[in-house]
């Protein structure tokens, strides 16, 4: 009971802190990459990756081979140092952007776009990175989108691919 109260308090404090920071430093377009001011969704590499994901997910299920091919394509498009991977992991994240689909507790593919601080702990160890694109296959948990641009992710995933655009 105390652990739940502390984790809820921590999430609540993180939301308040994120709200205060975003109010102090207004975000004109949260989907723009900080370094090069390009719209993330207009990047042809992101479009190619999402189209490949859509093609592979046409039957609603991604098997291990398809996930591995998606990971290889991600590393080819964005560079090995910009792609972070974990498997069978706990996922938490907070940031600004968009999560698709929001509010569904179980989904075969969850995509988060924007500026997201993503923390995972699983078979590949622990990593915490700021990413622009996160793909979680499959996802069980709470993907929450709070307008205008807040994203909160808490749950478990079979595979997580986090991509930082450079």
Please report, for each region that a protein language model flagged, where it lies by residue.
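Secretory targeting signatures
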Residues: 1-41
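Generic serine detector
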Residues: 7, 19-22, 33, 58, ...
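Intrinsic-disorder/low-complexity peptide segments enriched for small residues
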Residues: 15, 47-51, 163
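Residues at secondary-structure transition points
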Residues: 16, 66, 101-102
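N-terminal propeptides/leader regions of secreted preproproteins
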Residues: 25-96
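Mature secreted bioactive peptide module from preproproteins
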Residues: 76-166
């Amino acid at each position: 009971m105390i652990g739940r109260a502390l984790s809820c308090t921590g999430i609540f404090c993180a939301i308040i802190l994120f709200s205060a920071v975003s109010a102090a430093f207004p975000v004109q377009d949260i989907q723009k990459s900080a370094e090069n001011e390009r719209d993330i969704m207009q990047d042809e590499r992101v479009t190619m990756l999402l189209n490949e994901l859509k093609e592979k997910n046409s039957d609603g299920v991604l098997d291990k081979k398809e996930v591995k091919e998606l990971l290889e394509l991600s590393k080819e498009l964005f560079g090995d140092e910009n792609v972070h991977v974990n498997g069978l992991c706990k996922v938490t994240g907070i940031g600004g952007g968009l999560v698709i689909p929001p509010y569904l507790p179980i989904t075969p593919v969850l995509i988060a776009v924007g500026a997201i601080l993503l923390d995972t702990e699983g078979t590949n160890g622990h990593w915490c990175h700021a990413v622009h694109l996160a793909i979680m296959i499959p996802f069980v948990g709470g993907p929450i989108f709070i307008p205008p641009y807040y994203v909160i992710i808490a749950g478990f995933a079979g595979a997580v691919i986090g991509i930082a655009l450079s």
